[in-house]
């Protein structure tokens, strides 16, 4: 492989391709003469669209094929939405860079209503996220929540076809695809705690590939890394998967990191919340400490009940 070429493995969805093109442009900006090639591919998560993610293996379904491409030296890096990146990496691969975060909030999208509180009793809301379902059900148990899969365009099409009264999507994805005008209202982190890593793009590569790691270095955003590390540490310590509603969101003011987290029943009947504050350089420890507090407040019973089923 030429020293002036870097190959990006990416999913074929419009949002995944946007992320890959973003990384391509950043690499070309920092490294004159570098050729960046895209290797688009379909993953199991893109193909299995008729079953809720929680029932078919979770978000790891979106990254496995990309990782195989790197291990087989068909690609040098893979670009991921951080909220889709599993906790564990295959031997020889690792998360090298976390880019600057986009808007981490959820977005309320509807053609007839301004926000969740305005929805009439029994309105149908579409989302594939148990985290979103849990928090909506906690505040509006009268709403009917139906699973919603597919890429952003497909989901908007289902809303426009009248299958849903409203749908909930990640604000970052709509902004990146220049679909911000479809956002009826933003849902604050106080109203709906985001998923860990939501809005951030991560770059995975072979851990022994020093050439590629040097090329990627300028794309790292330190503050975003601190925030995402804290969020992922909480999730990892809880051993949380796609079957449990878990939210985590970190903010940094000066050098102080504030991490909020929640664990809930899928039906929204019981939500446990906690907050930890500390130095941003202790992000990992803050995440673990918050997980311990959530467990001590009853999250363990929720996790055990879900995983026994």
Swiss-Prot record:
Broad class of enzyme this protein falls into: transferase
Coiled coil: none
Segments traversing the membrane: none
Reaction it catalyzes: 4 porphobilinogen + H2O = hydroxymethylbilane + 4 NH4(+)
Keyword match Transferase: yes
Xref: PROSITE patterns: PORPHOBILINOGEN_DEAM
GO biological process, one term: protoporphyrinogen IX biosynthetic process
Cofactor: dipyrromethane
Any single Gene Ontology cellular-component annotation: cytoplasm
Cofactor mode of binding and number, as noted: Binds 1 dipyrromethane group covalently.
CDD domains registered for this protein in UniProt: PBP2_EcHMBS_like
Molecular-function annotations in GO: hydroxymethylbilane synthase activity
Modified residues (S-(dipyrrolylmethanemethyl)cysteine): 242
EC number: 2.5.1.61
Pathway annotation: Porphyrin-containing compound metabolism; protoporphyrin-IX biosynthesis; coproporphyrinogen-III from 5-aminolevulinate: step 2/4
Keywords: Porphyrin biosynthesis, Transferase
NCBIfam families: hemC
Family designation: Belongs to the HMBS family.
Classification via PANTHER family: PORPHOBILINOGEN DEAMINASE (PTHR11557:SF0)
Record-linked HAMAP family: Porphobil_deam
Complexes and interactors: Monomer.
Further comment: The porphobilinogen subunits are added to the dipyrromethane group.
Function: Tetrapolymerization of the monopyrrole PBG into the hydroxymethylbilane pre-uroporphyrinogen in several discrete steps.
Protein name, per record: Porphobilinogen deaminase
Organism phylogeny: Bacteria, Pseudomonadati, Pseudomonadota, Gammaproteobacteria, Alteromonadales
Gene it is expressed from: hemC
């Amino acid at each position: 492989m030429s020293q002036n070429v870097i190959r990006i493995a990416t999913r074929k969805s419009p949002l995944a391709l946007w992320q890959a093109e973003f990384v391509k442009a950043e690499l070309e900006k920092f490294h004159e003469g570098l050729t960046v090639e895209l290797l688009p591919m379909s993953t199991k998560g893109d193909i299995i669209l008729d079953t809720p993610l929680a029932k078919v293996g979770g978000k790891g379904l979106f990254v496995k094929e990309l990782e195989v491409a790197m291990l087989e030296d068909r690609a040098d890096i893979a670009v991921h939405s951080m909220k889709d990146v599993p906790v564990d990496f295959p031997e020889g691969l690792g998360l090298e860079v976390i880019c600057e975060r986009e808007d981490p909030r959820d977005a309320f999208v509807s053609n007839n209503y301004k926000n969740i509180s305005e929805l009439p009793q029994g309105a149908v809301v579409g989302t594939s996220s148990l985290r979103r379902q849990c928090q909506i059900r906690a505040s509006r148990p009268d709403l009917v929540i139906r699973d919603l899969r597919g890429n952003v365009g497909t989901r908007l099409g289902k809303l426009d076809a009248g299958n849903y009264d409203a749908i909930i999507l990640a604000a970052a994805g709509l902004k990146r695809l220049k679909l911000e005008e479809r956002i009826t209202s933003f849902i604050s982190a106080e109203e709906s705690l985001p998923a860990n890593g939501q809005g951030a793009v991560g770059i995975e590569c072979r851990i022994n590939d020093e050439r590629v790691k040097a090329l990627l270095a300028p794309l790292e955003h330190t503050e975003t890394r601190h925030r995402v590390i804290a969020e992922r540490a909480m999730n990892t310590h809880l051993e949380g998967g796609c079957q449990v509603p878990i939210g985590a969101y970190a903010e940094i003011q000066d050098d102080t990191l504030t991490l909020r987290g929640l664990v809930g029943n899928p039906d929204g009947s019981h939500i446990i919340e906690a907050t930890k504050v500390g130095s941003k350089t202790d992000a990992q420890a803050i995440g673990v400490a918050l997980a311990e507090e959530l467990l001590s407040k009853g999250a363990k019973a929720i996790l055990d009940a879900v995983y026994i089923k």
